[in-house]
From Swiss-Prot:
Family listed: Belongs to the TRAFAC class dynamin-like GTPase superfamily. IRG family.
Organism: Rattus norvegicus (Rat)
Any one GO BP annotation for this protein: positive regulation of flagellated sperm motility
Protein name, UniProt field: Interferon-inducible GTPase 5
Keyword terms of this UniProt record: Cell projection, Cilium, Flagellum, GTP-binding, Hydrolase, Lipid droplet, Nucleotide-binding, Phosphoprotein
Known function: Required for sperm motility and therefore male fertility, via positive regulation of spermatozoa fibrous sheath formation.
Amino acid sequence: MATSRLPAVPEEETTILMAKEELEALRTAFESGDIPQAASRLRELLATTETTRLEVGVTGESGAGKSSLINALRGVGAEDPGAALTGVVETTMQPSPYPHPQFPDVTLWDLPGAGSPGCSADKYLKEVDFGRYDFFLLVSPRRCGAVETRLASEILRQGKKFYFVRTKVDEDLAATRNQRPSGFSEAAVLQEIRDHCAERLRAAGLSDPRIFLVSNLSPNRYDFPMLVTTWEHDLPAHRRHAGLLSLPDISLEALQKKKDMLQEQVLKTALVSGVIQALPVPGLAAAYDDALLIRSLRGYHRSFGLDDDSLAKLAEQVGKQAGDLRSVIRSPLANEVSPETVLRLYSQSSDGAMRVARAFERGIPVFGTLVAGGISFGTVYTMLQGCLNEMAEDAQRVRIKALEEDETQGEVSLEAAGDNAVEKRSSGEGTSEEAPLSTRRKLGLLLKYILDSWKRRDLSEDK
């Protein structure tokens, strides 16, 4: 039997739907001519993003604020169960792992302080097993000295990335304000600190250093929000999913990025469902379990911090009642993601499933083959996309309620996605900015390649 060929796809056409290496693996499965194996590979790709580990080494000299930074990134207080130990003296004697409270596959490692008397740099690097970490946060409470430049050089030698996190800038600002009250300028002081750190890091061999000035006590100020978003942006494709979902939603930008990442999962989950339902392989559809839908929805719920533990923790941090935060949540999944709730939503989504499928078919005619095989793709896509949008909006409302921000709904609304964008485009309403085609086009391209390969396979068998 002749094997089917899945054409190569330009890299820029696959960055939203799936990473390049994922598509290559999928193409290999299709070229083998084993369609059930290809469908199984799709499920594996979806599951991989849920189990990818991320190891982050947090290093620096003693007393730099490493433990406090870890707590801030994990969204926990110093007295919360499982928080990294903090103190005025060195409290970390050996590498200590701190899994994220909600995502245990993401681990921040609190490394012992470097530069201690009697401990050479080489000995320190060996003791903390410097090579095991995916990337680093290099933390310093001062303007980058010999300890920091030595660590920076070693990280660069290993071919890895790091971000220089200058902590306790609030203390520097307060001291400068007291010393020079008449000519004090916060922006000027921060720029002076940044320039000095950049100069020292360039001397260590880093051409374009990433420097973040933060206060661990004020995660909404200075460069802390930028640290969070930059961390996500620079993660390799196979680490990005785990890293993003672990980040606290301290800014609207971080919330939007989290929603964009989960949007990829909506497409993958719907694609798996549609492919399996369309395949004429006995018993294959049964392998696609409703448990996957429940797990996806629970993942959205947890990722946006809408679960009871997250709401209670946020309420304590901002001095409000958890009930006040919960009062602005409107999603029917706010209380529980149960099989009964999912079944009801699934049934409701079936009403609009064919409309969504036909909207995709108008852009990619060959998609009709999949539509003819069943409406599972449209149903799953409609349901998950609607729930994702609702939960993202709930997370936005909770954020506004917690911080009491004076923002209008229009000013802070997250970018619309899913059915609304498809419907607007198919009906000719709105501009290209209102209904971006990039995600739809990428999904359509992959579906076209898959379905074309099936068609060629069928024709060769007929001959």
